[in-house]
């Protein structure tokens, strides 16, 4: 299936300005926006300035409610093939869906523990995939795996491989084979210690930057 990365050319050439204005008024309203300030600043002064600049923005009248994004379940894999003339590399991506942690538990210990476990697993898997990509007979040019929320109610384990032209299936099999190895045999103590060290270092860096 041929797709455009920026949408319909006809729509871009012929849309009416009112379409943009209506979209802005519908979704870019005060109750759906935030102001983020980063830096070494006088917090009280910045808050006062923000209130001065944005405090008088009127609330939207009859605001349109956000409809939840519902991704339907599927018993068999959903497969799509996309091509684009400007894409110079073959890649395969997949996602395994699961329910997201309910909002009321996010920020609690159980959710933080889950995030930490996923972070450790991603780090260890990606280290392996990187090592494989450096071998002379690697099945892919590069590969990675990660966990993340797809929507408010949906979580997913995601993987991706980039391959030489004509080797998409070979690369995909290489990634899935390594994931199956992890499923069956887990990780080594050395892999775990390296992943733990990376995470601790990132926390230390974040702490120092916040000081």
Can you annotate each of these PLM segments?
Residues 1-10, 32-38, 88-111, 129-211:
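M16 family metallopeptidases and their MPP-like homologs
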Residues 23, 45-46, 58, 102-105, ...:
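Short helix/loop capping segments that flank catalytic or ligand/cofactor-binding pockets
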Residues 34-93, 197-207:
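An aromatic/glycine/proline-enriched structural segment found at the starts
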Residues 114, 118-122:
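Long, His/Glu/Asp-enriched segments that create or flank divalent metal/ion-associated functional microenvironments
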Residues 126:
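Active-site and adjacent loop segments of nucleotide-processing enzymes
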């Amino acid at each position: 299936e041929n797709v455009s990365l920026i949408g319909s050319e006809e729509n871009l050439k012929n849309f009416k300005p009112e379409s943009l204005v209506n979209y802005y008024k519908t979704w870019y309203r005060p109750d759906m926006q935030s102001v983020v300030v980063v830096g070494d600043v006088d917090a009280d002064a910045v808050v006062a300035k923000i209130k001065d600049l944005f405090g008088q923005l009127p609330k939207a009248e009859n605001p349109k409610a956000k409809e939840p994004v519902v991704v339907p379940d599927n018993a068999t894999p959903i497969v799509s093939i996309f091509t684009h003339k400007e894409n110079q590399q073959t890649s395969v991506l997949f996602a395994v869906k699961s329910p997201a942690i309910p909002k009321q538990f996010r920020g609690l210990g159980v959710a933080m523990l889950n995030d930490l476990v996923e972070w450790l697993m991603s780090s260890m898997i990606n280290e392996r995939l990187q090592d494989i990509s450096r071998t002379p007979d690697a099945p892919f040019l590069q590969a990675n795996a990660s966990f993340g929320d797809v929507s408010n109610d949906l979580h997913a384990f995601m993987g991706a491989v980039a391959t030489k032209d004509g080797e998409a299936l070979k690369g995909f099999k290489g990634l899935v084979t390594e994931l199956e190895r992890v499923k069956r045999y887990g990780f080594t103590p050395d892999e775990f210690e390296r992943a733990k060290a990376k995470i601790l270092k990132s926390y230390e860096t974040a702490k120092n930057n916040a000081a």
